[in-house]
Amino acid sequence: MASGKAAGKSDAPTPIIKLGGPKPPKIGSSGNASWFQAIKAKKLNVPQPKFEGSGVPDNNNIKPSQQHGYWRRQARYKPGKSGRKPVPDAWYFYYTGTGPAADLNWGENQDGIVWVAAKGADTKSRSNQGTRDPDKFDQYPLRFSDGGPDGNFRWDFIPLNRGRSGRSTAASSAASSRAPSREGSRGRRSGAEDDLIARAAKIIQDQQKRGSRITKAKADEMAHRRYCKRTIPPGYRVDQVFGPRTKGKEGNFGDDKMNEEGIKDGRVTATLNLIPSSHACLFGSRVTPKLQPDGLHLKFEFTTVVPRDDPQFDNYVKICDQCVDGVGTRPKDDEPRPKSRSSSRPATRGNSPAPRQQRPKKEKKPKKQDDEVDKALTSDEERNNAQLEFDDEPKVINWGDSALGENEL
């Protein structure tokens, strides 16, 4: 119905989505929630969305005659120190006759409403699908078989087989990702190390310039894939993804610092240069299959050789000494330094051990709490924002003080 170039997000296969039984689901306490995840504007004040195809999300459980509805704009605000701050709008899909604009007939003009319909839909009919209770049902992933919204909009990747646990995992990921992403350099580095770290920083900057960004849902999917295909997302600990670190058996790489920082530890990036590719692991390893009660176990034995004349040989040896069977230990330069002792000069008025008279401390004004800011929201905005997840601003990843090899990762 609407025109415009899609943003390249029409992935297949189309999921079969079941939206309730003969009666529409009851509406939850947080308001009229959409069955589907939102599309989000990439910046403020963009025009209303246009779609390459019909604009109706894929849903094989709905009759073709009822494949019509509307996208509704929902303003979003993020609490801040100086008051609430607007963030790009979100648009939610509702079937005709449901949701906040349930009293409108298809095609009636109203600000913030975009009507869409699939080919062959009876726009005079009204849907009996109701709306979603967020306390009982997760949002369904968006899929568009005939083309999605234009390039001013995006939506987060949600796996089709996501369970109810995805919400709490995403929340814990968001909390851990708020940790400071930069640390001061410790100690002095050699010229070669400085050059390597500069190259590592350039790699990350180039990736960030290209717009590489991992959403909360994508990070959760990365951490909960099949074990052999998992990768550690930003903000995750090693043991959150691959289990506790051990000694003398599988899972024995990583000291306590690496376990806590995950990929933020620069030694991870350096060591990945020594890890075989999938093809190298398959065709260059000694493969040993073994049938076990729980299934087929495949063991891959691969040897990576770092020549002694390699410029980073000493750095790789140091990383292995620290991280192989490193559970319970930390790098020496990461341990807290003892406070320097005062010089043993005779006491004078200037350095007398007698305590100085302290000035009274000024009382700090209490910061404005988020709940006070939330009081400035209208009831309609509170209802709208109840089903929204604010996007975290991309963090600059610190790759640490260790070596990086010649190959870009």
From Swiss-Prot:
It is found in: Virion; Host endoplasmic reticulum-Golgi intermediate compartment; Host Golgi apparatus. Residues 226-333 are annotated as: Dimerization. It holds the Pfam family CoV_nucleocap. GO terms for cellular component: host cell endoplasmic reticulum-Golgi intermediate compartment; host cell Golgi apparatus; ribonucleoprotein complex; viral nucleocapsid. The keyword Iron does not apply. Residues 164-179 have a biased composition (Low complexity). Disulfide bonds join 320-323. Residues 180-192, 368-384 have a biased composition (Basic and acidic residues). Residues 215-331 form the CoV N CTD domain. Its main location: virion. Keywords: ADP-ribosylation, Disulfide bond, Host Golgi apparatus, Phosphoprotein, Ribonucleoprotein, RNA-binding, Transcription, Transcription regulation, Viral nucleoprotein, Virion. Residues 29-160 are annotated as: RNA-binding. Residues 70-84, 358-367 have a biased composition (Basic residues). Residues 31-156 form the CoV N NTD domain. The modification Phosphothreonine is found at residue 378. The modification Phosphoserine is found at residues 190, 379. PROSITE patterns: COV_N_CTD (PS51929), COV_N_NTD (PS51928). GO terms for molecular function: RNA binding. It comes from the Viruses. ADP-ribosylated. The ADP-ribosylation is retained in the virion during infection. Belongs to the gammacoronavirus nucleocapsid protein family. HAMAP family: GAMMA_CORONA_NCAP. Packages the positive strand viral genome RNA into a helical ribonucleocapsid (RNP) and plays a fundamental role during virion assembly through its interactions with the viral genome and membrane protein M. Plays an important role in enhancing the efficiency of subgenomic viral RNA transcription as well as viral replication. This is Nucleoprotein.
